[in-house]
Amino acid sequence: VEWTNFERATIKDIFSKLEYDVVGPATLARCLVVYPWTQRYFGKFGNLYNAAAIAENAMVSKHGTTIIHGLDQAVKNMDDIKNTYAELSVLHCDKLHVDPDNFQLLAECLTIVLAAQLGKEFTGEVQAAFQKFMAVVVSSLGKQYH
């Protein structure tokens, strides 16, 4: 993947402004509410019966934050995201048996949460850079499935 200087700077800027403990839980909660079939991977998380229960679930919040912190590795290794996520891809494919389409659903939810957090700063150009970044992340996480 070729990254422009603007794209690199934009991705680093976005992650420098992220409130991980807000964005992570909101992203995973949104995914579990909007795409309820994704809940099947979180059976040990307890009460996921409705949007309020999901939003208040401490395990959802913790895992959402973990997911966003996991993206730090991609930010730090933008030139080698596929290898950066090789082990995580194997884990999600072979052990957890996560449908790889769910990575894209989560990326879409993150984009929405991020747009809400950044407001006017989330211009079309910023969105394009972010979505390119997330497309590479999603592809890398799904690499083991191919």
UniProtKB/Swiss-Prot annotation:
Gene Ontology terms: biological process: hydrogen peroxide catabolic process
CDD domains, sorted: Hb-beta-like (cd08925)
Keyword Transport recorded: yes
GO cellular component, one term: blood microparticle
Binding residues annotated for heme b, in chain numbering: H63, H92
Superkingdom to which the source organism belongs: Eukaryota
Keywords from the named record: Heme, Iron, Metal-binding, Oxygen transport, Transport
Short name of one Pfam family: Globin
Alphabetical list of InterPro entries matching this protein: Globin (IPR000971), Globin-like_sf (IPR009050), Globin/Proto (IPR012292), Hemoglobin_b (IPR002337), Hemoglobin_oxygen_transport (IPR050056)
Globin domain sequence ranges: 2-146
Tissues in which the protein is found: Red blood cells.
A GO molecular function held by the record: metal ion binding
Assembly: Hb2 is a heterotetramer of two alpha chains and two beta-2 chains.
Annotated function: Involved in oxygen transport from gills to the various peripheral tissues.
Note: This fish has two hemoglobins: Hb1 (major) and Hb2 (about 5% of the total). They display the Bohr and root effects.
Protein family (similarity comment): Belongs to the globin family.
Name of the molecule in the record: Hemoglobin subunit beta-2
Source organism of the structure: Cygnodraco mawsoni (Antarctic dragonfish)
